[in-house]
Curated annotation (Swiss-Prot):
Entry keyword Plastid: yes
Location of the protein in the cell: Plastid, Chloroplast
GO CC, alphabetical: chloroplast
InterPro entries assigned: HNH_nuc
Domain of life: Eukaryota
Protein name according to UniProt: Uncharacterized 35.9 kDa protein in psbA intron 2
Alphabetical UniProt keywords: Chloroplast, Plastid
Keyword check for Chloroplast: yes
UniProt-annotated stretches for the region Disordered: 95-119
Organism: Chlamydomonas moewusii
UniProt main location, coarse: plastid
Length: 312
């Protein structure tokens, strides 16, 4: 390496006599000169001034050639090849312009309609697509929790920590999710006592309806109403109701040939229920039958307005 070091020392002295074009990008000489690391970076060389020398690209190539002949390092051979391929900046610009000509002409016209592989979307087609989408808005119910939806279809009284009461009055149609859903309940509560969380996250109301949480954003369920009965609600009561709902769902799937009244009487006899629980059981069976039919119809791909729920 002594010979290499002597060459670098010589080139370093020559550098003092030549003009530095490396900072002037507009100079035609710009790409002819480059900074060279005397001790290359791949050999742990740094960017300190004493380790840099300004070289013509041919000199740069020969230096790497000398190093390769001495060290047999393939990286030096790569440096030699790269430097020998260097060209003046102007030549590179011309070549690039030839490869990527500027877009001075208008793009070609689209092919005529009869030659298109796919017809263009007209305003009529777009409107038709939106209409189709609006017919299948209930598809998301296939992922809904049945017990949560059952609760959303009951008359519920909510009370917050400030003593404000809100009565949720559902629609008679379980398909009417604009009223009978956790999201709708959240919006109604938020209209009375604005809470950012209820507006942006109906999941909180779902947890309240399932009994997962006792209170959500200062709101709790105080009671529910079926016919003339009022049922006081606590978290423990809701969890028991959820167990009863699952039991009735299983019983319904095994006895679908029975009417709601027959199902209710049979289960009431099994549980030795009082009139208040009988009313709750009948309400659950009524919902379970309609819900099962609704989910089955949605799974068959039926549109919302094609689904007629059973009345018994």
């Amino acid at each position: 390496m002594d010979f290499y070091n002597i060459c670098c020392k010589y080139l370093k002295e020559i550098e003092l006599t030549r003009e530095d074009y490396s900072a002037d990008r507009n100079s035609p000489q710009y790409n002819l000169f480059c900074s060279h690391h005397i001790n290359p970076k791949f050999n742990k060389g740094g960017d300190e001034p004493e380790n840099l020398v300004l070289l013509h690209y041919f000199e740069h190539a020969y230096v790497h050639l000398f190093r390769w002949l001495i060290t047999d390092n393939p990286r030096d051979l790569g440096g030699f090849t790269s430097a020998m391929n260097a060209k003046e900046r102007r030549e590179l610009q011309i070549e690039k312009r030839r490869e990527n000509p500027p877009k001075l002409t208008l793009p070609p016209l689209p092919p005529p309609a009869e030659e298109r592989k796919k017809p263009a979307k007209t305003a009529k087609a777009i409107r038709a697509g939106k209409a189709v989408g609006s017919k299948y808005q209930l598809q998301s119910l296939k992922r809904a929790n049945p017990f949560t939806m059952f609760m959303a279809n009951l008359v519920l009284k909510f009370i917050n920590n400030n003593g404000i009461e809100v009565i949720h009055k559902p629609s008679d149609n379980i398909k009417d999710v604009s009223v009978n859903s956790a999201s709708a309940i959240g919006r109604a509560l938020n209209n009375v006592y604005p809470t950012e969380t209820l507006t942006n996250s109906p999941d909180g109301i779902s947890k309240l309806l399932k009994g997962t949480n006792k209170i959500v954003q200062n709101w709790r369920i105080d009671s529910l109403f079926i016919d003339d009965f009022e049922y006081e609600i606590t978290q423990e009561v809701l969890l028991k109701y959820q167990d009863l709902f699952e039991t009735l769902t299983t019983y319904f799937s095994e006895n679908q040939e029975l009417s709601i009244l027959e199902l209710t009487k049979s289960m009431a006899d099994i549980r030795n229920s009082n009139p208040k629980e009988i009313a709750l059981i009948q309400k659950m069976f009524t919902f379970i039958k309609k819900w099962s039919f609704l989910i089955k119809s949605l799974s068959e791909g039926k549109a919302d307005d094609e689904i007629d729920l059973p009345t018994d």
